[in-house]
Amino acid sequence: MLAIIPSLALATEFKTPAITPERVAALQGTPEAMLVVDVRGAGEYKSGHVPGAVNIPHTKLTERLDQLRQAKGVVLYCIIGDRTLLAEQTLLESGLGNVYHLDGGLMGWRKAGLEVRTGWGP
């Protein structure tokens, strides 16, 4: 139980603005669409992810900064927010702007009743 409490506490200290699952879903397929990044491991991504999301584990973000800089904006998510917080810190320290976090993470996406895809493709 103690291991969960610090993780949840971290998830509330985001430095980036939150964006709701409904807003992300509404922007998908439009010119205003942002790059949605699942920062979990590959196995977790395969078991369920936001449609259109790319999988870049938080430990690999610096290797993909060029791709991330080309996006209109970047929306980060994990299951509840702990790895999103680490990813956010990495991107902000790298000078990347227009970074957002998905409000509620993948759990929030599911709670909103939005589609979750499985497998490797976005």
What are these regions (language model features)?
Residues 77-78:
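Metallo-beta-lactamase
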Residues 2-35, 42-73, 82-122:
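Rhodanese-like catalytic fold shared by cysteine-dependent sulfurtransferases
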